[in-house]
Amino acid sequence: MNNVLEKDIYLGSSALGQATGMKFSDSDRVSGMKFSDSDKASGLKKSVPNVVFGMKISAAYGAGGLKSSAASKHSGFPLFFGLLVLWFVLSLSLSSCQCGKQSAAWDEGDTIRLKYAQLLTIVEHEGFTEVNVGNPWKKGTVLHQYILIKKGKKGDETAEMLMKGRNGSQDVAGASQAMAESQGAAGSHTLAGSLGLTGPDGCRADIVRTPICSSAVFTSPHCQLLYELGCQNAIRGVCDSKYILIEDIQKRLGKPAAASSESGSRQSSALSESGSGKSSTSASLPIADCGSSMQPDVEKIIALHPEALLISPFENSGGYGKLDNLNIPIIEAADYMETSPLGRAEWIKFYGLLFEANTADSLFAAIEKEYLALKTQAAKLPKGLSILTERKMGSVWYSPGGKSTMGILLKDANARYIFADDEHSGSLSLSPEQVIARGSEVDVWAFKYFGGQPLSRAALLQEYDGYKALRAFQTGNIYECNTDRIPYFETVSFHPEILLREFIILSHPQAKGLGALRFYRKM
């Protein structure tokens, strides 16, 4: 043999070469066979003496295929070898095809346009919906990914395909069994939960089977929203029940209603008069008290067999302890970290997808319409009165930043806010002296508090004598909202139009046609 060139050679015009497109270098060995570089135009020649399973081969690929020499001890070997390679090629092709399907499933999708929410990305794919929740504490990264798949056999097939694409050779059935056992859902093998999946930026990814029909809800605003969406029967467990001013939930808990008849009627009135909500209807299924949201009763949660947990995330929380190991989808309700009132309200669309509430889009559309109409109305009024919010808590006075949701609400009400020039989107931790110095000339002082008897000016001075330096205190222009009696948080979290109306009334007392205050009352 002459000089052997170091190059790659294709399997010529043989059928096997066309099927595979594989390259074999001069140093390649396939089943102990070495390919020489002395190929003829008619095909590929194998060098002699190469031993394959103890047999010498001197064959040439031609139009007629593979020919054995007389020295071959097993005349059927070439056919066997060809079939073996063909089987290998077909296996690779099928695997490649399957991977292609999985890749295409993720690559192809339609992104739903969201007008206000900055922390949500929703992409509709064939057979599933991908939802990425942005990390509000680490801009540009994903906090949690959700893969929403409808329940049923077809959904199971989609879940298996996506899991194989993410986890490679993971035993999907075994993962499903482990998930079922961790939930205590005997005999239930529904593919849902984390199952070891990871999303963008290494975040947790959960498969959520929709509609969610059973959930543990850790916050009162989301309980109220589910009632408005007609999904109240999906609430099977709650945390911090004593703070939930929803009469029907207290009944389903088997407790005396925490919300008085006054608060219940004011809640219903707020929603119906806004034109964007509907009165809550009662549900028949009982609700379990799962303890504190900071230390939930894990055993009670397991006993519920919930399909999801709705939890508000916190910065540097370090995860959710034992809840992380239950393999139950944890819906991190980061809506409260949106920096615009309508941005938080637009999360209604996400919750509508989770619970398959057909009214979600129309509910948000009504909220948006009412909010923008009120904003336009306020813009036509003269600049409003100046407003100071909240009060001293210990040694700190927390005030909304100028770019926060509350700061934007005050701006849209055309009110004068003493920290309007601030660039923060969260709360400002200020000393009482700083606030008094900045806001001594404010016209209106409006704050919230929880529990106890209605406050008086004398009680406020006992709390902090510096309040008397405020002009609003001196003139008696003080407004309070007792959130132990008034369903403030349950209502306004996803209904910013109601709170906007309140602030327009407070800062523009001369405005007509806005009705009476629903949450704040003059001290």
Predicted regions and their residues:
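Residue-level detector of bioactive/disordered segments in secreted/extracellular proteins
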Residues: 12, 63, 89, 99-101
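Long, compositionally biased low-complexity repeat segments characteristic
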Residues: 2-31, 38, 53, 164-181, ...
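Intrinsically disordered, low-complexity regulatory regions of eukaryotic signaling and scaffold proteins
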Residues: 19-20, 33, 42, 269-278
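Bacterial N-terminal signal peptides
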Residues: 80-95
